[in-house]
């Protein structure tokens, strides 16, 4: 076996490419291309949306878009192909005359005019869920939406309302009731800002708390209207095949691809609560999903879809949870992100910043759970912010005692560590053991406890094979969440089901890319704008997908996510192209399915690597 540097994939010697030992290694780049240029290519000649699908325009002569179909088609970009993938599947194409595969569903009628074709049983059955309308977004911007339910719960969480004598916490000592929401881990005092209500600013009430005098009963209860056990939907998290929330690349077309390969639990991309409450349309687009994600999956379980939120403020978490619970039609659970390490999120007091403020973290969970109706709430955690200071061992007990959280996901890394070292699954195992012990004593909790269900623990970090998944489950967690591993190898869910490695050929991997593009065209549209959007996200996906090294080339079949292969010779020409780390080759692959790139098209991947170069088409 050839000698390999630490972190290198053990490639069989006959596939290795000999290198000049005197060649200077290029410095590895990390992080994100934060200042990358984004160019949105749009059609120069628009067509009325109603006319484009063969309908009459309700605005008629007052419409701001042209209605001349022949003039539009005369200047329209050439068709990419003569078979529309959407029409072939559904018998109808929602893009109409704007479709870049128009030849597949248009004819010239007896009057010499273009006419769209629709099969007798043609129906576009892919529906988008969790679409919040423009009117709701307008009311959010103008603060006209009724959020009184959230406001009353916020007041209760902050202890601003006197508890009803008949409430579940009436037997808590008076001095402990006001202190309950002000407990902070490792501190004797904490200031509770009224700014968290979203109403008052620059006013602070300080609450002196002696931790030694606060009873355990007071710590596990707050004066707010909790739901009865039967009013919360219960989720069995055991052995679920969970696809992690993935910023930029975790879009509905990618989630649909993973669903076809065995995933059954999905998250939206992380959405920030503040722009959601401002009615910011691009942020609300992150919440959307597909009806497909909640249908029966190949493993025999119904798929579930969650919405992940990030915020550091109680009023944002609670009010956003109310809006989503009341306005969205496809949410199975809400997730509070307390693990995001990104500076932009951390500096706002959100993400992993909440690990340093457990009192605020718990209040956010309490508010979300109380306002979300039947929708359960989950939380995403990291070990801590610093390598030498893990905090979850203490925090998980408070989450169990002081909230009704359905599940907690633990990423076995610190914020400081990012992805530079392997995830600490021994620590995850310790937390799993503690959660199991607490669940065994759930019947011993007082009747006025908020907890009405066991707490599930989901492990996360470095899952790249079926062996990693089962090793994680053997640590005691209910299931393992898969993130980057699914981007590099989307069929990892098939491997878990089969309990063996599956070596996909270059032809099979190319078919996956075609499926991804077709998913994108169905979701974003098969017009020019939809094609360009699909191409952009396809290239982001390729920045991970190209990293796969065929398992047949391994000398030792135990792939690790952070390992990088040395230069090797692939088994065929297409496999070589799929393994290329050049953006120009990724663009070439996109042209197989989406046609030539526009003249002004440029692309810089969000995630840096040695291979990244700007590509122009």
From Swiss-Prot:
FMN binds at residues 245-247, 308, 380, 411, 460-462, 483-484. It comes from the Eukaryota. One of its GO terms (molecular function) is flavin adenine dinucleotide binding. GO terms for biological process: mRNA processing. Pfam families: Dus. The active site is at residue 340. It is an enzyme of class 1 (oxidoreductase). Keywords: Cytoplasm, Flavoprotein, FMN, Metal-binding, mRNA processing, NAD, NADP, Nucleus, Oxidoreductase, tRNA processing, Zinc, Zinc-finger. The keyword Ligase does not apply. It is found in: Cytoplasm; Nucleus. It catalyses: 5,6-dihydrouridine(47) in tRNA + NAD(+) = uridine(47) in tRNA + NADH + H(+); 5,6-dihydrouridine(47) in tRNA + NADP(+) = uridine(47) in tRNA + NADPH + H(+); a 5,6-dihydrouridine in mRNA + NAD(+) = a uridine in mRNA + NADH + H(+); a 5,6-dihydrouridine in mRNA + NADP(+) = a uridine in mRNA + NADPH + H(+). Its cofactor is FMN. One of its GO terms (cellular component) is cytoplasm. Residues 160-193 are annotated as: Disordered. Disruption phenotype: Decreased ability to complete gametogenesis. Its EC number is 1.3.1.89, 1.3.1.-. A zinc finger (C3H1-type) spans 42-70. Belongs to the Dus family. Dus3 subfamily. Catalyzes the synthesis of dihydrouridine, a modified base, in various RNAs, such as tRNAs and mRNAs. Modifies the uridine in position 47 (U47) in the D-loop of tRNAs. Also able to mediate formation of dihydrouridine outside of the D-loop of tRNAs. Catalyzes the synthesis of dihydrouridine in some mRNAs, thereby affecting their translation. Dus3-mediated dihydrouridylation of the mRNA encoding alpha-tubulin nda2 is required for meiotic chromosome segregation. This is tRNA-dihydrouridine(47) synthase [NAD(P)(+)]. It comes from Schizosaccharomyces pombe (strain 972 / ATCC 24843) (Fission yeast). The lineage of its organism: Eukaryota, Fungi, Dikarya, Ascomycota, Taphrinomycotina.
């Amino acid at each position: 076996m050839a000698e390999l540097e630490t972190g290198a994939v053990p490639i069989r010697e006959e596939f290795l490419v000999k290198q000049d030992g005197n060649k200077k290694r290029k410095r590895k780049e990390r992080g994100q291309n934060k200042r990358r240029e984004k160019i949105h290519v749009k059609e120069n000649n628009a067509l009325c949306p109603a006319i484009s699908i063969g309908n009459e325009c309700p605005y008629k002569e007052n419409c701001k878009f042209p209605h001349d179909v022949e003039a539009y088609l005369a200047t329209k970009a050439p068709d990419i192909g003569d078979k529309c993938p959407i029409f072939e599947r559904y018998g109808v194409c929602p893009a109409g005359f704007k479709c870049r595969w128009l030849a597949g569903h248009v004819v010239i009628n007896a009057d010499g005019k273009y006419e769209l074709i629709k099969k007798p049983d043609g129906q576009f059955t892919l529906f988008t869920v969790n679409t919040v309308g423009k009117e709701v977004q307008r009311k959010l911007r103008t603060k006209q939406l009724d959020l009184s339910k959230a406001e009353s719960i916020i007041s209760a969480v902050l202890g601003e309302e006197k508890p009803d004598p008949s409430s579940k916490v009436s037997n808590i000592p008076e001095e402990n009731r006001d202190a309950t929401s002000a407990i902070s881990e490792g501190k004797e005092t904490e200031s509770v800002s009224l700014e968290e209500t979203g109403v008052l600013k620059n006013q602070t009430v300080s609450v002196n708390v002696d931790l030694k005098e606060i009873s355990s009963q007071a710590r596990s209860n707050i004066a707010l209207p909790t739901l009865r056990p039967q009013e919360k939907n219960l989720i069995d998290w055991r052995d679920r095949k969970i696809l992690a929330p993935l910023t930029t690349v975790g879009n509905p077309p990618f989630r649909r691809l993973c669903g076809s390969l065995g995933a059954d639990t999905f998250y939206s991309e992380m959405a920030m609560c503040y722009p959601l409450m401002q009615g910011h349309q691009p942020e609300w687009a992150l919440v959307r999903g597909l009806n497909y994600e909640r249908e029966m999956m190949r493993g025999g379980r119904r798929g579930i879809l969650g919405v992940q939120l990030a915020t550091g403020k109680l009023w944002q978490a609670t009010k956003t949870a109310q809006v989503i619970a009341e306005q969205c039609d496809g949410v199975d659970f809400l997730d509070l992100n307390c693990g995001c390490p990104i500076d932009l999120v951390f500096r706002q007091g959100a993400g992993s910043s909440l690990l340093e403020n457990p009192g605020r973290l718990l209040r956010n969970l309490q508010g979300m759970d109380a306002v979300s109706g039947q929708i359960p709430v989950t939380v995403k955690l990291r070990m801590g912010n610093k390598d030498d200071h893990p905090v979850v061992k203490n925090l998980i007990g408070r989450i169990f005692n002081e909230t009704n959280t359905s599940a907690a996901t633990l990423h076995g890394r610190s914020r400081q560590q990012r992805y530079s070292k392997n995830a600490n699954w021994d620590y995850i195992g310790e937390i799993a053991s503690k959660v199991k012990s607490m669940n065994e004593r759930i019947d011993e909790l007082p009747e006025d406890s908020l907890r009405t269900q066991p707490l599930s623990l989901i492990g996360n970090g470095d899952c790249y094979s079926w062996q990693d998944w089962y090793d994680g489950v053997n640590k005691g967690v209910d299931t393992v969440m898969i993130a980057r591993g699914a981007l590099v190898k989307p069929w990892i869910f098939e491997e878990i089901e089969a309990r063996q490695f599956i070596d996909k050929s270059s032809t099979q991997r190319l078919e996956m890319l075609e499926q991804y593009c077709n998913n994108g065209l169905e979701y974003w549209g098969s017009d020019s704008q939809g094609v360009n959007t699909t191409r952009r996200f396809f290239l982001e996906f390729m920045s991970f997908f190209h990293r796969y090294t065929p398992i047949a080339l391994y000398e030792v079949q135990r792939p690790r996510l952070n390992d990088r292969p040395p230069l090797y010779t692939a088994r065929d020409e297409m496999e070589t192209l799929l393994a290329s780390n050049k953006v120009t080759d990724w663009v070439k692959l996109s042209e197989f399915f989406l046609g030539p790139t526009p003249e002004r098209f440029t692309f810089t991947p969000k995630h840096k690597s040695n291979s990244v170069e700007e590509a122009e088409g």
